[in-house]
C-alpha cells in the first residue's frame, strides 16, 4: 500500500507486548528478536523521526527472575514481580538502544497520569523533552502501584493514550497476529485479512474475538479499543506481526498489516478539542506585539501579557484577548493564575527568577494554542 508508508510519519509510537518480548518457555528475553527490532527503531530514528516505545514485560521478567511458578498471580504478587522486572526491563532497552548510540528514558505511568490534567501535562512535558534530546522514551504502566480498579489493564490502550499525549501521528501495535481478520484465523482457514479500516464501526468491533495469551493482558478487542482512542485523537494506527525479525522493516517493505485511519492529524484534533470542548477558566490580555506573534504561529511568552483575570490552575483553558479586548484565541496555560500575575510583562528569564523555579518559558505553548481570525493585525 504505497499511500501508507512509515516514511510519511514524523512521530511513531511502537507497542511491544510481553508475548513478543519474553520467551514464555525459558522466561527470558528474546534477545535476537529484540536486537533486530532495535535495528529497525534506530533506522527510523536516524532518519530524524521521533520514536516512542510502550513496552510490556515487567511482570513477566520479574516472575522469571524470582522463579515464581506458572499460573495467575495475586495483585500484591504482580506488583512485587513488577518491581523486580521494571529494573530488568529498563536495563534491556537501555542496552539494545545504546548499541546504536541512542539514549533511552524510562517513564512509568498510571491511569491517573492521563486522566488528571496536571499530571498529564507533566508526563507530556517529560516526553517532549526526551524527544527534544533525541532520546527514545520507553513507557510502561507502573504495575507496582496500579490496582485492579485503577489501571489501564493492557498496554494497547496505554499505547493509544501515550500516542495522544505525545501528539504522535502513528501508533504501531506489534502483535502475535498480523492484523484484523473478518473471522478468527485459527478457527477459520478462509478468514481474510482486512488491510484498511477507515472507521471503527460496530461490524469492526464484532470481528474482534478473544485472542489473549497467558503472558499478555491484551487481545484483539483491546486493540480495537486502542484504535478508537487513537483515531479519534488524530493518530493513525496499524496492527502488524511482531513474531518475525525486523517487524518494522517488514511493514516498510509492504508486509501484511491492518491500518486504522483517522480523518484528522493529531494537532488538528487536539486543537479542535481545546477550542470547542474545554470551558475557559480565565482570561489573558496581551499586547499588540504578542498578537502579531501568535498569528505568526509563535508561543505566548509572559512578556506579552498585560492583564490576568480569573482563577485558573496550570493546564486549564483560558481565553486570550488583544489590547482592544477582542478574542484572539484559546489555549492551555502553563502557569496558575497566581504565578501568571507575578510574571506578566516579564521576560522568561525574569519569570524563572521571580518564581524561584525553572518552569516553561512560554505562558502558552503554540501546540496548546488555537488562534482565530486572520493573520496579522493587533486584534
Curated annotation (Swiss-Prot):
Taxonomy of the source species: Bacteria, Pseudomonadati, Pseudomonadota, Alphaproteobacteria, Hyphomicrobiales
The keyword Zinc is annotated on this UniProt entry: no
Gene Ontology cellular-component terms listed: cytosol
Keyword Thylakoid attributed: no
InterPro entries in alphabetical order: AceGlu_kinase-like_sf, Asp/Glu/Uridylate_kinase, G5K_ProB, Glu/AcGlu_kinase, Glu_5kinase, Glu_5kinase/COase_Synthase, Glutamate_5-kinase_CS, PUA
Residues that, per the record, bind ATP: 15, 175-176
This protein's pathway: Amino-acid biosynthesis; L-proline biosynthesis; L-glutamate 5-semialdehyde from L-glutamate: step 1/2
EC code: 2.7.2.11
Entry's localization field: Cytoplasm
Residues given in the record as substrate binding sites: 56, 143, 155
Function: Catalyzes the transfer of a phosphate group to glutamate to form L-glutamate 5-phosphate.
Reactions this protein catalyses: L-glutamate + ATP = L-glutamyl 5-phosphate + ADP
Boundaries of every PUA domain copy: 281-358
A Pfam family assignment: PUA
Keywords in alphabetical order: Amino-acid biosynthesis, ATP-binding, Cytoplasm, Kinase, Nucleotide-binding, Proline biosynthesis, Transferase
BP GO terms, sorted: L-proline biosynthetic process
A GO MF label: ATP binding
Protein's recorded name: Glutamate 5-kinase
Chief location bin: cytoplasm
Root EC class: transferase
Coiled coil (UniProt feature): none
Similarity-based family: Belongs to the glutamate 5-kinase family.
Amino acid at each position: 500500500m504505497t499511500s501508507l508508508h512509515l516514511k510519511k510519519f514524523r512521530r511513531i509510537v511502537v507497542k511491544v507486548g510481553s508475548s513478543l518480548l519474553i520467551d514464555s518457555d525459558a522466561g527470558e528475553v528474546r534477545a535476537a528478536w529484540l536486537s533486530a527490532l532495535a535495528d529497525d527503531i534506530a533506522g527510523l530514528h536516524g532518519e530524524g523521526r521521533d520514536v516512542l516505545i510502550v513496552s510490556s514485560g515487567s511482570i513477566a521478567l520479574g516472575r522469571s527472575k524470582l522463579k515464581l511458578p506458572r499460573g495467575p498471580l495475586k495483585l500484591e504478587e504482580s506488583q512485587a514481580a513488577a518491581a523486580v522486572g521494571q529494573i530488568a526491563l529498563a536495563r534491556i532497552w537501555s542496552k539494545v538502544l545504546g548499541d546504536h548510540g541512542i539514549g533511552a528514558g524510562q517513564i512509568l505511568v498510571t491511569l491517573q497520569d492521563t486522566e488528571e490534567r496536571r499530571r498529564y501535562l507533566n508526563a507530556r512535558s517529560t516526553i517532549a523533552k526526551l524527544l527534544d534530546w533525541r532520546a527514545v522514551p520507553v513507557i510502561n504502566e507502573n504495575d507496582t502501584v496500579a490496582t485492579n480498579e485503577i489501571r489501564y489493564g493492557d498496554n494497547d490502550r496505554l499505547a493509544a493514550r501515550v500516542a495522544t499525549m505525545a501528539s504522535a501521528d502513528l501508533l504501531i501495535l506489534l502483535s502475535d497476529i498480523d492484523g484484523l481478520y473478518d473471522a478468527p484465523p485459527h478457527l477459520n482457514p478462509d478468514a481474510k485479512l482486512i488491510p484498511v479500516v477507515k472507521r471503527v464501526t460496530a461490524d469492526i468491533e464484532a470481528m474482534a474475538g478473544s485472542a489473549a495469551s497467558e503472558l499478555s493482558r491484551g487481545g484483539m478487542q483491546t486493540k480495537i479499543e486502542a484504535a478508537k482512542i487513537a483515531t479519534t485523537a488524530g493518530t493513525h494506527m496499524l496492527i502488524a506481526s511482531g513474531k518475525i525479525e525486523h517487524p518494522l522493516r517488514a511493514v516498510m517493505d509492504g508486509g501484511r498489516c491492518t491500518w486504522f485511519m483517522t480523518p484528522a492529524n493529531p494537532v488538528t484534533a487536539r486543537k479542535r478539542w481545546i477550542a470547542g470542548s474545554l470551558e475557559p477558566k480565565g482570561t489573558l490580555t496581551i499586547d499588540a506585539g504578542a498578537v502579531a506573534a501568535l498569528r505568526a504561529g509563535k508561543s505566548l511568552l509572559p512578556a506579552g501579557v498585560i492583564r490576568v483575570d480569573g482563577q485558573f490552575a496550570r493546564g486549564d483553558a483560558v481565553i486570550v484577548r488583544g489590547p482592544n479586548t477582542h478574542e484572539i484565541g484559546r489555549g492551555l496555560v502553563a502557569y496558575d493564575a497566581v504565578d501568571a500575575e507575578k510574571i506578566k510583562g516579564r521576560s522568561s528569564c525574569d519569570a524563572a527568577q521571580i518564581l524561584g523555579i525553572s518552569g516553561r518559558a512560554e505562558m502558552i505553548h503554540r501546540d496548546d494554542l488555537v488562534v482565530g481570525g486572520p493573520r496579522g493585525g493587533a486584534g
